[in-house]
Amino acid sequence: MGPCRGALHPLSLLVQAAALALALAQGTLPAFLPCELQPHGLVNCNWLFLKSVPRFSAAAPRGNVTSLSLYSNRIHHLHDYDFVHFVHLRRLNLKWNCPPASLSPMHFPCHMTIEPNTFLAVPTLEDLNLSYNSITTVPALPSSLVSLSLSRTNILVLDPATLAGLYALRFLFLDGNCYYKNPCQQALQVAPGALLGLGNLTHLSLKYNNLTVVPRGLPPSLEYLLLSYNHIITLAPEDLANLTALRVLDVGGNCRRCDHARNPCRECPKGFPQLHPNTFGHLSHLEGLVLRDSSLYSLDPRWFHGLGNLMVLDLSENFLYDCITKTKAFYGLARLRRLNLSFNYHKKVSFAHLHLASSFGSLLSLQELDIHGIFFRSLSKTTLQSLAHLPMLQRLHLQLNFISQAQLSIFGAFPGLRYVDLSDNRISGAAEPAAATGEVEADCGERVWPQSRDLALGPLGTPGSEAFMPSCRTLNFTLDLSRNNLVTVQPEMFVRLARLQCLGLSHNSISQAVNGSQFVPLSNLRVLDLSHNKLDLYHGRSFTELPRLEALDLSYNSQPFSMRGVGHNLSFVAQLPALRYLSLAHNGIHSRVSQQLRSASLRALDFSGNTLSQMWAEGDLYLRFFQGLRSLVQLDLSQNRLHTLLPRNLDNLPKSLRLLRLRDNYLAFFNWSSLALLPKLEALDLAGNQLKALSNGSLPNGTQLQRLDLSGNSIGFVVPSFFALAVRLRELNLSANALKTVEPSWFGSLAGALKVLDVTANPLHCACGATFVDFLLEVQAAVPGLPSRVKCGSPGQLQGRSIFAQDLRLCLDEALSWVCFSLSLLAVALSLAVPMLHQLCGWDLWYCFHLCLAWLPRRGRRRGVDALAYDAFVVFDKAQSSVADWVYNELRVQLEERRGRRALRLCLEERDWVPGKTLFENLWASVYSSRKTLFVLARTDRVSGLLRASFLLAQQRLLEDRKDVVVLVILCPDAHRSRYVRLRQRLCRQSVLLWPHQPSGQRSFWAQLGTALTRDNRHFYNQNFCRGPTTA
């Protein structure tokens, strides 16, 4: 809505730019538009599709900026002056602005140009990230640089002059400059001694560069050297000469095992890799060594001589399946803490048993052992016999080995063991002790091996989508048996596992009826995960053998609940004295269950994904289903197909509730006053429902509500002061709704206390003079993503753009734009017409001018009537509450508050009538002091009382003044309209308006009503029938 569109378009752009600059200079808008200032001096400009570095205002506190992130934009040219004003800039991120064509999503060619002094102008710069940019040379860099990332670029040559002068540099990343995703004609060329001048360099990463040898002349200060996934197939002591300070060396993936590769792979030549016995002997400070994916068939003990400080050794994805059972290479690694031997399987072979070599017993400091993907079918005492005396062993990974027989009791002999992962196997029940035979069984055909990245499973308690269940990471002993073939659970499985505290049995096929005897040996169990099974909850003593059970996950056990006619008993919950967390989510519970849950200890219940709507529809049968949970603090009722939530439903929830989730239901109405029935409620989640307005009341006074999530609804209207009484409210999420504005009247004095006010993803109407801009600027510290993620939904030219694309407070409105255009057009027309008319008919014009001059005084006297006080007198039946509500909350708001400068003056009985005057005096004054008389009718068949009297006065005014002032608004159009209405529709259609049923037609209705109230009715009369009333 720029001023004076069309003819003055260049002028409008100038006015807008000047207005925006003025606003920025005054400090009223966010200082770093279009970017966002975040804590710790970070200016975030990520994902803004910028084509150049923003020119921030001189008034912005650029001196306080220490970090600038321009990640994932479209900046292809960096100038000398781009960063000169950031005098304290320390970190600069320019990643993903102009990626090489092969890395670009659309494979578009791109080249980034960096002028010579771009970074030299920032002498304080310490961290620079230029990754994923199409640059071929290293730009000039300041000597203050500490960390430099040039990964996934087109830099293929490093020589001594390239990084000269970077004496403070400690971290250098040059990964992926020449590999299958970023192909080149040759390998990365590192000249001998090219990095030798970097005396403080400690971290060097050259992964994925097609290197065939270790670069010569590396600085002796290096502590981390990463050379994985190149083509270095020989290693000798001279390759790592002088690197005595190395702590981590990664040379994995240089001679790959291609039958387990997840990306393009070059087969390792026969007889390689070749590692000299003394390759690592001089690296006495080495703590981490990675030899994964290196096609190793054996381990030479001499490789590890001198590595007394080695703590982490990764030997995964090799061919060490035989070596594991007899190697002596581990005897000297007394400090080793983590050992990874995963996916050292024999192609097409699965072992019947596995014996770990005796040298494993010398790893006295070993804390974590990963042997998943070896493929052996039986786990017995002899399998882990070598580990029995390791006092520090805490974590053991045995997943994805196709184990079908497992003696779980063997883990009772490991007093320090904290986590055992046996997931993704084929365990079907308890196993008898078996002697090891060492035999192998050949598979019948090729096996498709899963990728290693999908197998690095974390602990059982890794937080997921649901935050109700506690994590197992802090517990002393966790056993994960998820994704196996268990059909039943037998107490014999858990013999000698009394100290087990967390047990995962999810994603099995357990279909038995638990009766209180399945977990008898697990007297200390605190967390039990039985999700994604087929448990039959019939017995009232289920799980009662677990006296210390605190968390029980029974989610996704829907099959028994879907069986028609089968009952389910949940009374066992009352008999678990320590139970605090219970999940019954996604079970489709709808009928034939216990009428009430009872527990004195339960604090969190996840009941999402059920059909509570059907349960509450059964009269009072399940009305008190949750009432017996006296200590309940958190309750999740999401995805329960709720269409309504009656006050009695909330009244029968536990009064101790602090968090209530009602996400993703079908709620189109919510009784806000009923929140008073939950006196301790602090957080309410109503996201993903079908609320269209916040108009029925307001948040009750005295509520303890602190967090309210209303995102993902269709809210388009909020009544004033809706949130004002919730004085403790601090976080409000209104994102992804249909709001066209955000009014300060919604919040009252609460606005300043809000810590989070999320209004992103709303179609805000960015009209000139939009009041929400000033309000959002006042509370901008609480609005996440205000500069870039709060966007306009209309008008069309601003749709999808930031609300600060132009300053909506200083731009001119549309009416003034037309005035500017009309005046300029008139000036041009007069400058052309006046000389021409003067030349052709000057005397005639002089005569007409004086004739009009003599005629004007009479017209002036005739029009010299006092200006009317109101634009319209609104008449309606106050007895009809729905009509009165529409007049006060819709009609008045639209015509008086939302029209800006074109606001109309309405005369309302209860607001504008003068006390002390008679009814008739006020009525007469209202009709004769208003330009129009607006009748708001619910129906047209019966009109009486004040409506009838007002109509007669309006008709009298028609007879006396010859002015038709009647405008009809019919809220509920019916087929049987009065004859007067039908006649008036014939003669003067624009003065009879019908309230549209569809919200999409309301905008047109208000426009028509504004026209009907501001123009004379005689212009609306149908000329085929009459000419309308005329003045004398």
Curated annotation (Swiss-Prot):
Gene3D superfamilies: Ribonuclease Inhibitor (3.80.10.10), Toll/interleukin-1 receptor homology (TIR) domain (3.40.50.10140). This is Toll-like receptor 9. SUPFAM superfamilies: L domain-like, RNI-like, Toll/Interleukin receptor TIR domain. The lineage of its organism: Eukaryota, Metazoa, Chordata, Craniata, Vertebrata. LRR repeats lie at residues 62-85, 87-110, 122-147, 150-166, 167-190, 198-221, 223-242, 243-268, 283-306, 308-332, 333-356, 363-386, 390-413, 415-440, 472-496, 498-521, 522-545, 547-574, 576-600, 602-624, 629-652, 654-677, 678-701, 703-725, 726-749, 751-774. The gene is TLR9. Keywords: Cytoplasmic vesicle, Disulfide bond, Endoplasmic reticulum, Endosome, Glycoprotein, Immunity, Inflammatory response, Innate immunity, Leucine-rich repeat, Lipoprotein, Lysosome, Membrane, Palmitate, Receptor, Repeat, Signal, Transmembrane, Transmembrane helix. It comes from the Eukaryota. Residues 26-815 are extracellular. The keyword Membrane applies. Monomer and homodimer. Exists as a monomer in the absence of unmethylated cytidine-phosphate-guanosine (CpG) ligand. Proteolytic processing of an insertion loop (Z-loop) is required for homodimerization upon binding to the unmethylated CpG ligand leading to its activation. Interacts with MYD88 via their respective TIR domains. Interacts with BTK. Interacts (via transmembrane domain) with UNC93B1. Interacts with CD300LH; the interaction may promote full activation of TLR9-triggered innate responses. GO terms for cellular component: early phagosome; endolysosome; endoplasmic reticulum; endoplasmic reticulum membrane; endosome; lysosome; plasma membrane. Residues 1-25 form the signal peptide. DNA binds at residues 47-51, 72-77, 95-109, 132, 152, 179-181, 208, 262. A lipid is attached at C258, C265 (S-palmitoyl cysteine). SMART domains: LRR_BAC (SM00364), LRR_SD22 (SM00365), LRR_TYP (SM00369), TIR (SM00255). One of its GO terms (biological process) is canonical NF-kappaB signal transduction. It is a single-pass type I membrane protein. The chain crosses the membrane at residues 816-836.
